[in-house]
C-alpha cells in the first residue's frame, strides 16, 4: 500500500499525501508492536513530516492527525528509553489537542484526556511526581465530565485513570488519597463486570490486587487479605478459560499472597502460594524464558527467604541458588539490566551461609557482590 501511495503522491501530492501519511503511521505502529524499532521510528517520523506540511495548508483538517502522530512518536520513544524525545512529542500532542478542545470540546476532550494520562504515566516513570500528579488529575477531571454524559463509553478509562492516581499517591505516602482512588476504580469496575464480565473481570482483578498491596503496606491485613483473595478468585476463573493469557497474572497474585501470609506468620498458607507461583512460572519459562525468567528468579528468592525463616536451610539454599543461576544467565544477555539483581542474590547467599556458619562460602559470595 505504501509503494502504491508513494507513486500516486508523485502524480498528485494534494490528493494522496494524506493517505500516504496514514499508511506511514499504521506501518510505524505495526513495526513498533513487532519490536522493529528502526523501521517504526522511520515511519512515525515520515508520517509527522507529511502531516506538518498538510497542517500548514489546512490546520483544521489535519491537526488532529498530527497530534495523533506526535502521541505515537512519544509512546515509541518512551518505550525506547529516550525520555527527552518522548517528552517533546507528548507535549507537542497536548499543545495541539488543547487548541482543538477550545474549538470543539465535545470532539476532542477524549483525546486530550488520553494525552494527559500518557504524560502522567511518563512523568511518573521519570520520578517527576508533581508533573505526573498534574496530568493525572487533569485527565481525571475531563474523564469524569465525559463519564457523566456517557458512562458506557468513558467509565472504563476513568477507572484506569483512578488506578494510576492511586498508585502515584501510594508511592508518595498519601494514603488517604491513594485509598480513595483505588476504591473509586474498584467501584467502577464492579459495575462494569455486572454488565460484561468477560471484558472487565481482568481489570477488576488488577484493581483488587492493587488494593491488597495497598492495605498490606498500610498495616490493614484483614482488608489486604480480602482483596488478595478476591483477585485470586477472579484470576483462577480466567485461567480456566484461557491459561495462556492469564497464568502470568495468577502467578503474580499467588506470589503476593505468599508474601502476605509469610508476613502474617501463617507459614502453611504462605508456602502453598509461593509454590503455586513457582509451579506456574516454571511452566511459563519453558515457553518463553525471556519474558518470565526474572519473575521465576524473584519467586525462588521469596521461597528461599521463607524456608530460611522456617528453619529449613536445605530448601532455602536450593531456592537461593536456583535464583542465582537465573540471574547469571540474565546478566550474560543484559549486564546493565540484571547485574544489580545478581549482586543482590550474591548478598542474600552470603548472609545465608554466614548464618549457617559456612564462612568460606559467605566470603565467596560477598566478594562476588562487591566485584559487581
What residues fall within each predicted segment?
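Low-complexity/repetitive intrinsically disordered segments
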Residues: 1-18, 23, 33, 347, ...
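Flexible helix-coil transition and linker loops at the boundaries of alpha-helical arrays
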Residues: 7-18, 53-63, 98-109, 145-155, ...
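Conserved alpha-helical positions within TPR/SEL1-like repeat arrays
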Residues: 18-33, 48, 64-78, 94, ...
Amino acid at each position: 500500500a505504501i509503494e502504491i501511495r508513494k507513486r500516486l503522491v508523485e502524480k498528485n501530492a494534494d490528493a494522496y499525501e494524506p493517505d500516504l501519511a496514514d499508511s506511514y503511521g499504521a506501518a510505524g505502529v505495526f513495526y513498533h508492536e513487532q519490536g522493529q524499532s528502526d523501521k517504526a521510528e522511520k515511519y512515525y517520523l515520515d508520517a509527522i513530516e507529511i502531516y506538518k506540511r498538510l497542517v500548514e495548508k489546512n490546520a483544521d483538517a489535519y491537526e488532529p492527525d498530527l497530534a495523533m502522530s506526535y502521541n505515537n512518536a512519544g509512546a515509541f520513544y518512551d518505550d525506547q528509553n529516550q525520555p527527552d524525545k518522548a517528552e517533546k512529542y507528548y507535549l507537542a500532542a497536548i499543545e495541539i489537542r488543547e487548541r482543538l478542545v477550545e474549538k470543539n470540546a465535545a470532539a476532542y476532550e477524549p483525546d486530550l484526556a488520553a494525552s494527559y494520562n500518557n504524560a502522567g504515566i511518563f512523568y511518573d516513570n521519570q520520578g517527576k511526581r508533581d508533573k505526573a500528579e498534574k496530568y493525572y488529575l487533569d485527565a481525571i477531571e475531563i474523564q469524569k465530565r465525559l463519564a457523566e454524559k456517557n458512562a458506557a463509553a468513558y467509565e472504563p478509562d476513568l477507572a484506569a485513570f483512578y488506578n494510576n492516581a492511586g498508585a502515584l499517591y501510594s508511592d508518595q505516602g498519601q494514603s488517604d488519597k491513594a485509598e480513595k482512588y483505588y476504591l473509586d476504580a474498584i467501584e467502577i469496575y464492579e459495575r462494569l463486570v455486572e454488565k460484561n464480565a468477560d471484558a472487565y473481570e481482568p481489570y477488576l482483578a488488577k484493581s483488587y490486587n492493587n488494593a491488597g498491596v495497598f492495605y498490606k503496606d498500610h498495616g490493614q491485613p484483614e482488608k489486604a487479605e480480602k482483596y488478595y483473595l478476591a483477585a485470586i478468585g477472579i484470576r483462577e476463573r480466567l485461567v480456566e478459560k484461557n491459561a495462556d493469557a492469564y497464568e502470568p497474572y495468577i502467578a503474580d497474585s499467588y506470589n503476593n499472597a505468599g508474601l502476605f501470609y509469610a508476613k502474617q506468620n501463617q507459614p502453611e498458607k504462605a508456602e502453598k502460594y509461593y509454590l503455586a507461583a513457582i509451579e506456574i512460572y516454571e511452566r511459563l519459562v519453558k515457553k518463553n524464558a525471556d519474558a518470565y525468567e526474572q519473575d521465576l528468579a524473584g519467586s525462588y528468592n521469596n521461597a528461599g527467604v521463607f524456608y530460611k525463616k522456617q528453619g529449613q536451610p536445605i530448601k532455602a539454599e536450593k531456592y537461593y541458588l536456583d535464583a542465582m543461576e537465573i540471574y547469571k544467565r540474565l546478566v550474560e544477555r543484559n549486564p546493565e539490566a540484571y547485574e544489580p539483581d545478581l549482586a543482590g542474590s550474591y548478598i542474600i547467599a552470603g548472609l545465608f551461609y554466614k548464618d549457617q556458619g559456612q564462612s568460606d562460602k559467605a566470603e565467596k559470595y560477598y566478594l562476588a557482590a562487591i566485584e559487581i
